[in-house]
Amino acid sequence: MSVGILGTKLGMTQIFDEAGVAIPVTVIQAGPCTVTQVKTKQTDGYFAIQVGFGEVKPKALNRPLLGHLAKSSAPALRHLNEYHTDSSSDYALGQQIKADIFSEGQIVDVVGTSIGRGFAGNQKRNNFGRGPMSHGSKNHRAPGSIGAGTTPGRVYPGKRMAGRLGGKRITIRKLTIVRVDAERNLLLIKGAIPGKPGALVSVVPAKVVG
């Protein structure tokens, strides 16, 4: 598995290809990330690197985390993430990982947190149909039956009902990188990704099978 990168979602826009066709893209501020730990098979049982992103004031972090970051001479970083690799020999503590590790046309997966929409009903959360809106009906947006009677005498686990919508970890797979701005560390990815502008995202090379 190749190394990914942490970044923030900046928003969406559109660019035009050679034929003049508009392509909707999401702009991601990708890195720069600092390698804060290198894991090897001898010391940890597997190969991986840990990267940090999002510089903050030192007082925002606790002392154990500041001590961990000091080993790589990294500044105070808010977010840490680990990426598995086939070999960690190509990476060193304090190394910078930037947007240029990706290329145009590359297929990637984007991991983020979906926008939280609070408590939502069945129509919005589960795409249920509604009841009649006229002719004396009082069942407009009610959930309807949630089970039988005495048997089974309970509501089955997993029954789709009203509840909190969004705010969950989401992975959007097999998106295409349309453009890489190595100078400004920007990635332009075709399509939408989870989260609102400013949200933390992780971009990793996709596992394309076949």
UniProtKB/Swiss-Prot annotation:
Subunit (UniProt): Part of the 50S ribosomal subunit. Forms a cluster with proteins L14 and L19.
Protein name, entry field: Large ribosomal subunit protein uL3
Role: One of the primary rRNA binding proteins, it binds directly near the 3'-end of the 23S rRNA, where it nucleates assembly of the 50S subunit.
Residues in the signal sequence: none
A single MF term (Gene Ontology): structural constituent of ribosome
InterPro entries reported for this sequence: Ribosomal_uL3 (IPR000597), Ribosomal_uL3_bac/org-type (IPR019927), Ribosomal_uL3_CS (IPR019926), Transl_B-barrel_sf (IPR009000)
SUPFAM superfamilies: Translation proteins
Gene Ontology BP terms: translation
Top-level taxonomic group: Bacteria
Keywords from the UniProt entry: Ribonucleoprotein, Ribosomal protein, RNA-binding, rRNA-binding
GO cellular component: cytosolic large ribosomal subunit
One matching Pfam family: Ribosomal_L3
Lineage: Bacteria, Bacillati, Cyanobacteriota, Cyanophyceae, Nostocales
Entry-linked NCBIfam families: L3_bact
Organism whose genome encodes this protein: Nostoc punctiforme (strain ATCC 29133 / PCC 73102)
Span list, region Disordered: 122-155
Family, per entry: Belongs to the universal ribosomal protein uL3 family.
Keyword Chloroplast: no
